[in-house]
């Protein structure tokens, strides 16, 4: 008889409540799977509670050992993992730096370097069970001390750009900005206990973020490539920013898992213009693209021997004002810009209608705690009047974006909408190598955001006061206090009451213009396994294989 939980303990009491929410059509199947497995239910048990059979973990075709896989992807300058700010960084280092927990395309959470975990009833204490038999590729054993050390590092708010601190907020002493005394306890070589300062239903999902790669005690950014100690099955074999990077299978390492197939994986950077990727596909220079966007989705459909995969997600783009900029401190200025933009029109013009309109609060209808608000009004006359009342009727706003296909086009569409109101806007388009350096600092710019399983995760990461990724520089005491309460509530209906207020604050304060939620697409060669589009852009090197 199969276990219902990954640790053999009884199911967490909240899981039955989640099941009732599904039956009452208050929670989607995907969100139930995410929340149940985050609280320790096995995937099999979570599916069976809904009367479903879990999909087989086996690949659809038999993978062959060996070969090379060539992937179009931006090759960015490496950073310390907790300061990663783009998925591409993690997809390369994932070859040797692994994760405690993995978020799967079906919405479930799977233990990797953690074998299992459990939570008490009110989600204020977690027990993390380290996977036995794991070794670093230098021969040392992977233990609970490694887990505790990494979590302690995630909690250090003094590290510039450390977004993991936002995810570990319930472990942090607000006075020191570091892990609270007694918050992280090593019980024995294989067990870590987390004692939270407040209930937190998002702690395990936070450990699945691409910024949470597990590093050794000897880690330094300077020796990340020259001395690549990790637990994974690959090693770096060259890394040239903006050009190319590669991984090779580490044949001298006894990896704890046994499913690494490709001998070599190459990441080739063609820049931000996707026409180069199409040329690479047609000339057999690459085997898959990182993402297919815009008109190139249909163009890549026509490449012989290639196939399309897709994922419906809560991925999005936001156009935000940085509220530390003098001109954008006035919320009426920010609201005027939002009032001038018809999000449905931007979806059609910027992303060819491949998604659904959003509502300027960064919480998606697929999030379990989403609260429906009245439709926003587009009133360009009022927008200009508000801007003029703020003394900026003749001011020319500079709207910045990266120079690529869909993000450039979407930002162009937003600028055109604002101009229709009579508000002046000029566009500045930056190459990726420039844009990525200061994406959180621009006064008025657009940024793409990945999905997170819970709406409260997104708001805590992107809009809580003082967080590393708070690119809007938004700081609102009522918002922070309400968010803290919402993060402690497991019941989606109860949390939705607070979420409605959070969404309203986002709109009232004009924090973002959020045009749409987007569907994701990727093309790859037929016969390449492990290459399907992932809802959070993960590429797992150990799953890539030729059939």
Language model features: what each stretch is:
Residues 219-222, 252-299, 415, 424-426:
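Ligand-site clamp/hinge motif
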Residues 339, 354-389, 406-409:
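Structural transition elements
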Residues 522-547:
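Long beta-strand-rich cores associated with HINT superfamily self-processing modules
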Residues 71, 139, 291, 416-466, ...:
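Periplasmic binding protein-like
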Residues 164-217:
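Surface-exposed binding/hinge segments that line
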Residues 72-121, 152, 229-230:
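N-terminal lobe/hinge region of extracytoplasmic solute-binding protein
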Residues 1-31, 50, 54:
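N-terminal secretory signal peptides
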Residues 104-108, 199-266, 272, 381, ...:
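Gly/Pro-rich hinge or "lid" segments in bacterial periplasmic/extracellular proteins
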């Amino acid at each position: 008889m199969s276990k219902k939980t990954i640790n053999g303990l009884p199911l967490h009491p909240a899981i039955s409540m989640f099941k009732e929410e599904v039956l009452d059509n208050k929670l989607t199947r995907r969100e139930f799977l995410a929340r149940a497995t985050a609280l320790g239910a096995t995937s099999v048990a979570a599916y069976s509670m809904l009367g479903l059979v879990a999909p087989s973990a086996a690949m659809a075709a038999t993978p062959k050992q060996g070969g090379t896989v060539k992937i179009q992807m931006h090759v960015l300058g490496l950073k310390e993992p907790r300061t990663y700010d783009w998925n591409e960084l993690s997809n390369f280092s994932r070859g040797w730096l692994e994760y405690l927990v993995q978020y799967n395309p079906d919405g479930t959470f799977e233990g990797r370097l953690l074998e299992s975990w459990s939570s008490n009833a009110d989600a204020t204490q977690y027990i993390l069970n380290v996977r036995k038999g794991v070794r670093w590729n230098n021969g040392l054993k992977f233990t609970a001390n490694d887990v505790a050390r990494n979590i302690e590092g995630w909690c250090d708010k003094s590290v510039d750009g450390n977004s993991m601190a936002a995810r570990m907020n319930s472990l942090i002493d607000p006075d020191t900005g570091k892990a609270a005394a007694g918050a992280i306890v090593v019980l024995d070589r294989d067990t870590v206990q987390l004692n939270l300062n407040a209930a937190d239903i998002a702690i395990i999902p936070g450990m699945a973020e691409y910024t949470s790669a597990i590093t050794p005690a000897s880690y330094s950014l300077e020796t990340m490539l020259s001395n690549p100690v990790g637990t994974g099955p690959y090693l770096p074999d060259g890394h040239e920013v903006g050009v190319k990077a590669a991984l090779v299978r580490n044949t001298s390492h006894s990896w704890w898992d046994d499913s690494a197939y490709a001998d070599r994986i190459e990441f080739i950077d063609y820049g931000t213009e996707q026409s180069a990727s199409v040329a690479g596909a047609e000339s057999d220079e690459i085997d898959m693209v990182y993402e297919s966007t815009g008109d190139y989705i249909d163009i890549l459909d026509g490449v012989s021997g290639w196939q399309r995969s897709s994922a419906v997600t809560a991925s999005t783009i936001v156009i935000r004002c940085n509220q530390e900029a003098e001109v954008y401190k006035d919320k009426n200025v920010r609201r005027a810009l939002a009032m001038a933009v018809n999000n449905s029109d931007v979806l059609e013009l910027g992303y060819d209608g491949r998604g659904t309109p959003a509502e300027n609060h960064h919480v998606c209808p697929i999030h379990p705690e989403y609260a429906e608000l009245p439709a926003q009004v587009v009133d360009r006359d009022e927008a200009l009047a508000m801007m003029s009342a703020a003394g900026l009727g003749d001011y020319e706003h500079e709207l910045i974006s990266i120079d690529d296909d869909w993000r450039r086009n979407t930002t162009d569409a937003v600028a055109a909408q604002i101009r229709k109101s009579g508000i002046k806007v000029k566009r500045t388009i930056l190459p990726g190598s420039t844009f990525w350096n200061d994406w959180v600092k621009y006064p008025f710019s657009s940024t793409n955001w990945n999905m997170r399983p819970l709406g409260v995760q997104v708001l805590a990461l992107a809009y809580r006061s003082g967080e590393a990724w708070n690119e809007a520089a938004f700081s609102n005491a009522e918002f922070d206090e309400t968010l803290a309460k919402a993060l402690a509530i497991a019941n989606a209906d109860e949390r939705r009451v607070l979420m409605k207020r959070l969404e309203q604050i986002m709109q009232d304060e004009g924090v973002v213009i959020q045009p749409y939620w987007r569907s994701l697409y990727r093309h790859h060669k037929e016969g390449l396994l492990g290459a399907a589009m992932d809802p959070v852009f993960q590429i797992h090197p150990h799953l890539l294989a030729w059939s």
